[in-house]
Design a protein with these regions (language model features):
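Short hydrophobic beta-strand motif reused across regulatory alpha/beta modules
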Residues: 177, 381, 483-491, 549-557
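Bateman (tandem CBS) regulatory domains
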Residues: 426, 437-450, 456, 487-490, ...
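Intrinsically disordered or compositionally simple regulatory linkers and C-terminal tails
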Residues: 1, 423, 570-582
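Alpha-helical transmembrane segments and immediately membrane-proximal extracytoplasmic
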Residues: 1-438, 442, 447-464, 470-473, ...
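The conserved cystathionine-beta-synthase
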Residues: 452-469, 476-477, 493-498, 502, ...
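A short, acidic, flexible beta-alpha connecting loop/helix-capping segment that sits on the rim
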Residues: 385-387, 543, 555
Length: 582
């Protein structure tokens, strides 16, 4: 039987649990995919698997109104659920960064249902957000039921997300590195085996339940030569700016909808109506998008340019108005279109250069997706698994590296971290920084506080606290509020005469404005010590009610901070040392 101790002490136990999670998530992804297809078939009256663009041409009224009705249902549902659960939904990245992998299964199902409704009604959003939220939520809930430690719970969240992407695209390598890059915050030896096991198990189950053909499939490019690599680099540079444009478009749309004098629950309906009107002109904008579908890339330059712009606008309208979902699949379509468009422009300007069209399509797909999603290795591996062509992957790697460099230097965020920034969440990735906020002054402080009233004399202070009895004594006002720190070395200074014995100790108190609050994290505590240049600081109830509840020494705060850093490093390496995996 799997218990907490067996999981802590057995690599095989963790692998078995990860494999079981992967299989369960693979089943969930297959069911969600069928639910989306069924919903779209019902809403748009299309045959199973038929493209939504074809339905738009057959029934314009349904195309115009279906996204609006879906948006209205979504808005009402969110409003009603908010009365029951008003908290924000924590996604896998935020959970691993701030909460040690703790996620709510109910909240994850909320997001999954909202994304299913959004995608099913034609909103230009992807289902990958629902897949990863459901997978990570299932894994986190199971880990919490087993009372796993923080590092193991974070790993299980990564397993759930990796399994979701692996099952969705039939790409276990891409799914695993999606977890490493976005959900875990990095690759470590300790997490390689469980995340790899979950990815493979998810793909196996998904292939067993559904069509085993890959979600993305391309013919192999021709031989890759020197000019092709140069073209991939230039394309990556331009793709980086396109990625920034797509992310900023969502922000502009969101601000625009917020400025409208309509209730929040009505915004998705209005956004859906605008999306439906756009779909009457460009039907391919409905739904997540077909990825970099070769059928869309076989169109003329003008048609590809129109679809590229329309897809950016459609995604911005959908996400900005309140539909739930992500830009994973949309970014693949945008990148593929951009690569095909770039090839056509080069052929017009420099005919006979001999560039490979499909290579530029793949490089554009990887570069734009990496810029928006923030997972460069994932996109390279996704292309590699889709094409099974190492030369193509090398060209894509160049475009991806240049694109992510442009986005990082010019913008500084991926789409996920940009959304965190707009919400005021202080994280740039899934690196575990939650322990910093959990190690507070309340946890660091000691309760044996030595205080004295400011009205008492120096002689009284000497009698109450003889030389060597205490390093620091805190002065307090008659009402108990903090008034400053008294240096006991100065109090027992031999140079002080008898006339100084009657001096009120309040005159010796310093640093009256230097104190800690119970909720201050260890980083804030150390910064306060650095600025105050004292050995100990009091912890007060609040800046207004300055009653002392404890004190923290700089030496102890530094020691605890170092221990936690060592513990984090040990967990990354899978060590079982004093401060590693316990």
């Amino acid at each position: 039987m799997l218990t907490r101790r067996s999981l802590r002490d057995s690599v095989l136990g963790v692998l078995m649990l990860a494999g079981a999670i992967g299989a369960g998530v693979g089943l969930a992804v297959a069911l969600l995919h069928e639910a989306v297809v069924w919903t779209q078939s019902f809403v748009f009256s299309v045959a199973h698997g038929q493209d939504l663009g074809e339905a738009a041409l057959a029934d314009p009224w349904r195309t115009l109104l279906a996204p609006a009705i879906g948006g209205l249902l979504l808005g009402v549902m969110v409003k009603l659920v908010r009365r029951w659960r008003s908290n924000d939904i924590v996604d896998p990245v935020e959970a691993n960064a701030l909460y040690g992998g703790k996620m709510s299964l109910i909240d994850s199902l909320r997001l999954t249902l909202a994304t299913l409704l959004s995608n099913g009604s034609g909103a230009s959003v992807g289902m990958e957000a629902a897949y990863t939220q459901a997978g990570a939520g299932i894994a986190s809930t199971l880990g919490q039921k087993l009372h796993l430690r923080r590092a193991d719970l974070r790993t299980l969240v990564g397993c759930g997300a990796a399994a979701a992407i692996s099952a969705a695209y039939g790409a276990p390598l891409a799914g695993a590195f999606y977890a490493f890059e976005l959900v875990m915050g990095g690759y470590t030896i300790a997490t390689l085996a469980p995340i790899g096991a979950a990815s493979v198990a998810a793909v196996a189950v998904a292939h067993w339940l559904s069509d085993p053909s890959p979600a993305l499939f391309f013919g192999r490019p021709a031989a890759v030569e020197g000019w092709d690599y140069v073209a991939c680099g230039v394309l990556g540079f331009l793709a980086g700016w396109l990625s920034i444009l797509a992310m900023q478009a969502v922000t502009v749309a969101e601000r625009g909808f917020r400025a409208l004098p309509i209730p929040v629950w009505a915004r998705p309906a209005l956004g859906g109506l605008a999306l439906g009107a756009l779909a009457l002109a460009v039907p391919q904008v409905l739904g997540a998008g077909p990825g970099a579908d070769p059928s869309q890339l076989a169109r003329g330059l003008e048609a590809m340019a129109i679809l590229l712009v329309a897809k950016i606008v459609a995604s911005a309208l959908s996400l900005g108005s309140g539909f739930r979902g992500g830009l994973f699949s949309a970014s693949l379509l945008l990148g593929g279109l951009f690569g095909g468009l770039a090839y056509g422009v080069v052929e017009l300007l420099v005919p006979g250069l001999g560039l490979d069209r499909m290579l530029l399509v793949l490089a554009g797909m990887g570069a734009v997706a990496a810029g928006i999603i923030g997972a460069p290795v994932t996109m390279v591996l996704l292309v590699l698994e889709a094409t099974q062509d190492f030369w193509a992957a090398s060209g894509v790697l160049i475009g991806v590296v240049v694109s992510t460099t442009v986005v990082r230097q010019a913008f500084g965020y991926s789409f996920a971290t940009w959304r965190f920034h707009l919400r005021g969440v202080p994280i740039r990735g899934a690196y575990d920084v939650g322990w910093v906020s959990e190690l507070t002054a309340m946890r660091l402080m000691r309760g044996d506080v030595k205080t004295i009233l400011t009205t008492q004399t120096l002689d009284t202070l000497r009698r109450l606290h003889p030389l060597g009895a205490a390093k620091t004594v805190f002065a307090v006002e008659p009402d108990g509020s903090y008034a400053g720190i008294i240096d006991m070395g100065a109090v027992h200074d031999p140079s002080l005469g008898d006339e100084d014995a009657k001096t009120p100790v309040g005159e010796l108190a310093k640093h009256a404005d230097d104190f800690l609050r119970p909720g201050d994290d260890v980083r804030s505590v150390l910064q306060r010590f650095c600025s105050a240049e004292v050995e100990a600081l009091p912890v007060v109830t609040s800046p207004t009610d300055r009653r002392i509840v404890g004190y923290v020494t700089e030496a102890y705060a530094l020691r605890r901070y170092s221990q936690e850093l060592e513990r984090q490093r040990g967990e990354e390496l899978g060590e079982r040392s004093l401060y590693g995996r316990d």
